């Protein structure tokens, strides 16, 4: 197997010499570490190390770490042991939280390449699990052999074409011991249910199921790559300064609309929503009445239709401050991170006089019942915001401009007090920050 590993060394790894093995001490990672030690013997330029992630979830965790240290010492491989605290929250499973903790450790590695020991059986299990979850082409492409883990760092899975039984024979032939995680026997976990109950029966009926599933994953990876390419082109064509042009998005076919929004979310670093929620948002965006603002709420923020654009707004980290003093600098914009935006200025025929802005003006949030002086009577601020098409989600963080005496001078970007306005004055413009 070491000969095959060296023969099929990926071109993408040329010129990279610092390799770190994710080392649990189980059969698979023992096999990978041994194989890379053999490769190191033939290619001395390879720098090899290992990392063991101590999750602290098993009473045997300390013993596993000690086993890993002993084996690495015998193979003359430097080992670092990283202890992590696994916290599952928001409906996340302990298994998923532990996986994320491991990958955080891998991302912090000083090595250029992180090598993991996933094999052909793991790949088959992953494909079936994704299928049972209703995954699309990207999910069914399963685990790639090589991908970027972090800037300047690659994740490599060199064993994906090798079944577990071959790895077991290899490890036994070399006399290595390995540890068994007792949680791998718990069939309450779906992967273990597949591994111990379902796949053995499938193998009896279809002995070559692993290679067939691997081929299916390869085809799905090709399909996913084409989808991504088209989605990136559509996304670029639909982009505007403020988000996506709604008309351009809705001119696409329904599948391309969905893929464009998924590509947009991916570019923002936001996870994909449930397919049904995305479909409903697009339906509402297409048929919403003028002035309506359909919203798709996500953990990181929300997507919404605002006038003729689709916009992404990050979730506010805190309530706006009770008040913020205006720092008047002769029309220079003022960045207001605590409000989530920037206050800019334009000279207009009927704007706020500079004298009022220089003498104690301040910003404050809506509290309800505010009214602004108009040509005839006074207008309620809530009506001005609604008529301007400001989505309800943004109204509570839309700052109002007051004079030192507490008089409402302006709703930035929307209206200026008729009573306070003067020729050659200044119009405040509110520019909410976007991700």
Curated annotation (Swiss-Prot):
Gene3D superfamilies attached to this UniProt entry: 1.20.59.20, HUPs
An annotated GO BP: tRNA modification
Keywords annotated in UniProt: ATP-binding, Cytoplasm, Ligase, Nucleotide-binding, tRNA processing
Gene Ontology MF term list: ATP binding; tRNA(Ile)-lysidine synthase activity
Location, primary (coarse class): cytoplasm
Catalytic activity: cytidine(34) in tRNA(Ile2) + L-lysine + ATP = lysidine(34) in tRNA(Ile2) + AMP + diphosphate + H(+)
Claim: Nucleotide-binding is one of the keywords in the record: yes
InterPro entries the UniProt entry points to: Lysidine-tRNA-synth_C (IPR012796), Rossmann-like_a/b/a_fold (IPR014729), TilS/TtcA_N (IPR011063), tRNA_Ile_lys_synt (IPR012094), tRNA_Ile_lys_synt_N (IPR012795), tRNA_Ile_lys_synt_subst-bd (IPR015262)
Localisation per UniProt entry: Cytoplasm
EC number(s) stated in the UniProt entry for this protein: 6.3.4.19
Superkingdom of the source species: Bacteria
Family from the record: Belongs to the tRNA(Ile)-lysidine synthase family.
Cited function: Ligates lysine onto the cytidine present at position 34 of the AUA codon-specific tRNA(Ile) that contains the anticodon CAU, in an ATP-dependent manner. Cytidine is converted to lysidine, thus changing the amino acid specificity of the tRNA from methionine to isoleucine.
Protein name: tRNA(Ile)-lysidine synthase
Encoding gene, per UniProt annotation: tilS
